[in-house]
Amino acid sequence: MNISTLQLILETFSFFIYFILTFLFFAQAIFKNHWLKTFNFSGMLIANVSIFLLLITRWITAGYFPISNLYESLFFLVWGLNTIWLFLYKNNMRIQLLDNSVSLLLTLLVGFLHFILPQEMREISPLVPALKSNWLMMHVSVMMISYATLMIGSLLSIIYLYFLYRVDKLLNKINAVNLMTSNQNSNSLIYNLSFNTLLNSSKSMEYQILLKDLSLIKLSKRLDNLSYRLITFGFPLLTIGIIAGAVWANEAWGSYWSWDPKETWALITWLIFAIYLHTRIIKGWQGKKAAMVASLGFFIIWICYLGVNLLGKGIHSYGWFF
């Protein structure tokens, strides 16, 4: 069996594992089956190992760390996202909406690599002189790990905002005006919501079904804190990655910063999360306002990583679309 065949097998296997798991995670959300939880975790672990083996295979074959092109770096990002999810799951940080979102995201990413990315962009090729540096591993790997961490943290903020929306909707339906004072809003109420009070406010079947969502609403504060912790971990990595890239650029091209589109968007990404941490730590923001800033970061990362790269402009581009 040659390397190309092995790579294709691992790639195809990983995609179908993620594809099946996406449906099973949604089934788990509906049927609340403990067996499905165990199966889904095992499936994510198997897919993680499969991608790890794919990266190791390319590393051995090429002779350099496999993050030199879009195919390799995106698989490294997928592996990072999967690894962070496994870590959270094993540490009892289990959130159904996060499970569904991550599995769907991983399926789309691997599907893009398997079905859409041109074959020539998957091939192992010799490094250009500028990439023959130890800074390649340092810069790109740290950036990818920071992206994975910040993506999960931002995704948790998006889920948190969805919970806030559900709380507002739920309170309107059960007419829980008596629980709110004139100076309260849904953002402060979400931390102080009384399950028993809401349960006693309505006896109808419709409201009883709605009140089942309170078990998820109770996770909201945990979501907010977990998002903050992940972003706090990912932000220094992003900073280190950008600095490493600047040092590498100076060695390769004689300039620390050239305002390449990738560099510009990396700075924008850094500023978004710097603003989030500043408002959270210095200004004391919590809840909705801080989560909105973090949620914006999720989309900014994708523009920085994929959007700019695929436009075919600048030294970081892969030159596919234009």
UniProtKB/Swiss-Prot annotation:
Lineage of this protein's species? Answer: Eukaryota, Glaucocystophyceae, Cyanophoraceae, Cyanophora
Q: Extract one GO BP annotation from the record.
A: cytochrome complex assembly
Q: Which residues cross the membrane?
A: 6-26, 45-65, 69-89, 97-117, 144-164, 230-250, 265-285, 291-311
What is the official name of this protein in its record? Cytochrome c biogenesis protein CcsA
Residue ranges of coiled coil: none
Q: Which family does it belong to?
A: Belongs to the CcmF/CycK/Ccl1/NrfE/CcsA family.
* GO molecular function annotation: heme binding
Q: What does this protein do?
A: Required during biogenesis of c-type cytochromes (cytochrome c6 and cytochrome f) at the step of heme attachment.
What domain of life is recorded for the organism? Eukaryota
InterPro entries for the chain: Cyt_c_assembly (IPR002541), Cyt_c_biogenesis_CcsA (IPR017562), Cyt_c_biogenesis_CcsA/CcmC (IPR045062)
- The answer to whether the entry has keyword Acetylation is no
Q: How does it sit in the membrane?
A: Multi-pass membrane protein
> Pfam family example for this protein?
Cytochrom_C_asm
Disulfide bridge partners, by residue number: none
The primary site where this protein sits is: plastid
Annotated GO CC locations: cyanelle thylakoid membrane; plasma membrane
Annotated compartments: Plastid, Cyanelle thylakoid membrane
Q: How does it assemble?
A: May interact with Ccs1.
Q: Which UniProt keywords apply?
A: Cyanelle, Cytochrome c-type biogenesis, Membrane, Plastid, Thylakoid, Transmembrane, Transmembrane helix
